[in-house]
Every structure is written in structure tokens, then in C-alpha cells.
């Protein structure tokens, strides 16, 4: 009867593969067992509430009209969209009110698509609320601190048209 011998290197390789396989299976099981059973956090991009586009004139101005190709000066306040909040306003993210007005050329892609869509037609002195779905705001990528797939609410006051 012939005795089969295994070299120590082959035995170690077989043992190492078996051990690694067992450890991998154990780790996968532990990870599954320790998973978070709670619902996703409210800030998770997959659970953010989605808004439909809307624009509402809060105050109609009396000055020059905002048209594409013109440089505008505005004050704005930005909130996360929250359907339970007043006028869809959730957490305030940013404002220029009380600071330096924001200036941009309308209709050139210098701002998010929702502004290029929602600001034309405003008159100096006017205030408008824009509710923007993600594709008219910062999309899937977001723009920290704004998470991806966030719907946003802006209130914009038109200060100047050049």
C-alpha cells in the first residue's frame, strides 16, 4: 500500500484557504447579524422627500424685468424641502440677506437650472419662491452641505438688472 504524503507547503496552502473561507463566511454572517434594522435616516438620499417644481410670486416688483443674458443682483434664502414645513421649508441652509447680494448672468448656466427657469420675468423689487426637484437643483451629486437628490426651496428678491 502506497502512503500519500503531502508537502508542508501544500498542506499549509490548503489549510490557509480553508481557514480564509471559514473566516469569510463567519464575517459575512456577523455583518448580516449586526445590520441596522432601523429605517434609513431622514438625511439619506434615498429617503429625501421629492418636490415638484413650482414658482410663486410673493411680491410682484415694479422695476426692470429679469431676462436671459442680463446680469442680475439678488438676495436669496435657501431651505431643504420639507413637505411638513411651512411652504415646504425645512432646515435653512444659506442666505445672502443681510450680506452681499449675489450676482449672475441669467440664462447662461451660471446658476442651477431651477434659477434659469424660475427667475425670468421677475421685476426689480419682486420676491419669488421656487420649489425645485433635484434635477433642477444639484442633482444626484449634491453640493455639500446639500445632499444628493435633495429638493430645495428658494426665496429670491430681485434687487437689480443690468
Features from the language model and the residues they span:
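Cross-family detector of peptidyl-prolyl cis-trans isomerase
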Residues: 2-162
Amino acid at each position: 500500500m502506497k502512503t500519500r504524503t503531502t508537502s508542508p507547503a501544500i498542506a499549509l496552502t490548503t489549510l490557509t484557504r480553508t481557514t480564509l473561507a471559514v473566516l469569510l463566511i463567519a464575517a459575512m454572517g456577523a455583518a448580516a447579524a449586526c445590520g441596522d434594522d432601523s429605517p434609513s435616516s431622514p438625511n439619506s438620499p434615498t429617503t429625501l422627500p421629492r418636490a415638484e417644481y413650482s414658482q410663486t410670486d410673493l411680491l410682484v416688483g415694479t422695476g426692470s424685468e429679469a431676462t436671459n443674458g442680463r446680469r442680475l443682483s439678488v438676495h436669496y434664502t435657501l431651505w431643504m424641502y420639507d413637505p411638513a414645513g411651512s411652504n415646504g421649508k425645512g432646515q435653512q441652509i444659506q442666505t445672502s440677506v443681510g450680506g452681499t447680494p449675489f450676482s449672475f448672468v441669467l440664462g447662461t448656466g451660471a446658476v442651477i437650472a431651477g434659477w434659469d427657469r424660475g427667475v425670468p420675468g421677475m421685476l426689480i423689487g419682486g420676491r419669488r419662491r421656487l420649489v425645485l426637484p433635484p434635477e433642477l437643483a444639484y442633482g444626484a451629486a449634491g453640493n455639500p452641505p446639500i445632499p444628493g437628490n435633495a429638493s430645495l426651496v428658494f426665496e429670491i428678491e430681485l434687487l437689480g438688472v443690468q
